[in-house]
Amino acid sequence: MIKVGIVGGSGYGAIELIRLLQTHPHVTIAHIYSHSKVDEPLKLTFPHLQHIMQHFEALTVDNNDCDVIFFATPAPVSKTCIPPLVEKGIHVIDLSGAFRIKNREIYEAYYKETAAAQDDLNHAIYSISEWQSFDNNGTKLISNPGCFPTATLLALHPLISEKIVDLSSIIIDAKTGVSGAGRSLSQRVHFSEMNENLSAYAIGNHKHKPEIEQYLSIIAGQDVSVIFTPHLVPMTRGILSTIYVKFSSEYTTESLHKLMTSYYANQPFVRIRDIGTFPTTKEVLGSNYCDIGIYVDETTQTAILVSVIDNLVKGASGQAIQNLNILYDFEVTTGLNQSPVYP
């Protein structure tokens, strides 16, 4: 059995890791770390986890017996705590943005904090699971993608890699539930501010914009810029990303649908919807699926892609476990076969 540790045990990402890893046949949760709740029983913070008798612990590097440690922490914590663990030879899967952006200046412009050391950035492997493979011996630090980038890049990847679109025309209109903001309180997630309300936020300066651009640029082999506008909607979970991009050659809904279904034919967690149907966030709730609906406006030769995920599962903890499966050469669906919760 692989011994796993979870850092940031009092946050939503960690809660999902605990929930999902309980059913993983090759994993045992050895330690749950939280610096603010050391020695407290897990069930005191999360009453729905009454059946788990573990207590929160303080993270240590010396004598740490974990094979893999998941970090579901803010980026500054990850930057400080992860390098010593990697140096010790422990595999780390980081759910924060600390190691996603390889250019330190760009990171600091968007995150408003000092970037990780360049050596650490160079060694971190950014992994959207559907297009990644690892060397178990050589890979020590996996940088899990953000939630908006996951939904967006999975939809755009086939079009960019096939070089069939105008790279200057990408517009991303994305909606997210409030759990994406974490458990910390702020005015914009207060019930009276959020309920019966819809708001755009972080226009032009959202942390996920350079992440999307960086990895689209890698796929395209040239610099790519996007227009990205996120919105906060009054629901707990879910991301719906509507993406508009113009073709550089003629396409129809049928021909694009054929391309997308072929591209993801062997990827169990990406479900391309039938022509004329479009996914909703509730249809992936609690699951590791990304569902994508496709339409081509043939008059303007514009693709309209609707991509939905659960931001806490495929957009965070589920994909982290998917990366664990790839790292250890397990069947990619291991521990992640949960159907969406509906209604």
Curated annotation (Swiss-Prot):
Record-level Gene Ontology MF annotations: N-acetyl-gamma-glutamyl-phosphate reductase activity; NAD binding; NADP+ binding
Any Pfam family hit: Semialdhyde_dhC_1
Record-level GO cellular component terms: cytoplasm
Record keywords: Amino-acid biosynthesis, Arginine biosynthesis, Cytoplasm, NADP, Oxidoreductase
Catalytic activity: N-acetyl-L-glutamate 5-semialdehyde + phosphate + NADP(+) = N-acetyl-L-glutamyl 5-phosphate + NADPH + H(+)
GO BP, one annotated term: L-arginine biosynthetic process
Pathway assignment: Amino-acid biosynthesis; L-arginine biosynthesis; N(2)-acetyl-L-ornithine from L-glutamate: step 3/4
Broad enzyme group: oxidoreductase
Annotated SMART domains: Semialdhyde_dh
Subcellular location: Cytoplasm
Active site: 147
Enzyme Commission number(s) from the entry: 1.2.1.38
InterPro entries with a match to the protein in the record: AGPR_AS, AGPR_type-1, NAD(P)-bd_dom_sf, NAGSA_dehydrogenase, Semialdehyde_DH_NAD-bd
Similarity comment: family membership: Belongs to the NAGSA dehydrogenase family. Type 1 subfamily.
Entry function: Catalyzes the NADPH-dependent reduction of N-acetyl-5-glutamyl phosphate to yield N-acetyl-L-glutamate 5-semialdehyde.
Classification via PANTHER family: N-ACETYL-GAMMA-GLUTAMYL-PHOSPHATE REDUCTASE, CHLOROPLASTIC-RELATED, N-ACETYL-GAMMA-GLUTAMYL-PHOSPHATE REDUCTASE, CHLOROPLASTIC-RELATED-RELATED
Name this protein carries in UniProt: N-acetyl-gamma-glutamyl-phosphate reductase
